[in-house]
């Protein structure tokens, strides 16, 4: 039941997000060709839709603004990375998709610039995690991105773990099904099965 609820929630959330378009007016003085001039003007942008390019021409945000901050719905790109989704007070907040340079992708809930809540993380190598996240910074190395709560991790080799996670590791009740059919079920601690279900 947990698994079905998780999939239904994620589908509805991202279907609604995909339909989001700004109804706000264009920000006054929007000129992507003049980043310095634009930077000065963004401080005054509020309740409008515009594009901001940083002084180095590397970071681009196109979307809704409120009191000079990205706020509402917008797209952020930086050195090959891209975030599309909701913002609040200059940080990713709500539903959003973050694509990494290496091809990894996170689609899910955000809170104050971090993965927080339900989300799907697809790795460039084909692995996939669907489940809960807690206070995870998007710019941390993979081994520090914290899967927390209940989730399903499917490995590209056919292995699969369904169960509880803590700080990115299998921790709590869970079932690990190997590609060869072997099943390990019981209580896990820091990725190790410590109590097998008989």
What are these regions (language model features)?
Residues 4-14:
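Sec-dependent N-terminal signal peptides
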Residues 16-198:
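Glycine/tyrosine- and acidic-biased, solvent-exposed loop/turn segments at the edges of beta-strands
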């Amino acid at each position: 039941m947990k698994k079905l609820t998780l999939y239904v929630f994620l589908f509805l959330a991202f279907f609604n997000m995909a339909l989001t378009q700004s109804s706000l007016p264009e920000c006054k003085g929007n000129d992507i060709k003049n980043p310095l001039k634009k930077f000065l003007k963004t401080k005054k942008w509020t309740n409008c839709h515009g594009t901001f390019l940083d002084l180095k021409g590397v970071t681009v945000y196109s979307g809704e603004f409120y009191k000079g901050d990205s706020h509402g719905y917008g797209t952020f790109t930086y050195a090959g990375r891209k975030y599309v989704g909701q913002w609040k007070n200059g940080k990713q907040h709500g539903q959003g998709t973050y694509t990494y340079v290496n091809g990894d992708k996170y689609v899910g809930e955000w809170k104050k610039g971090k993965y927080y809540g339900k989300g799907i993380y697809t790795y460039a190598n084909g692995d996939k995690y669907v489940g809960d996240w807690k206070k995870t910074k998007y710019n941390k190395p993979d081994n520090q991105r914290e899967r927390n709560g209940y989730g399903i991790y499917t490995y590209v080799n056919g292995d699969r773990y369904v169960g509880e996670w803590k700080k990115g590791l299998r921790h709590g009740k869970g079932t690990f099904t190997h590609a060869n059919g072997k099943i390990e079920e019981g209580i896990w601690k820091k990725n190790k099965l410590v109590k097998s279900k008989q």
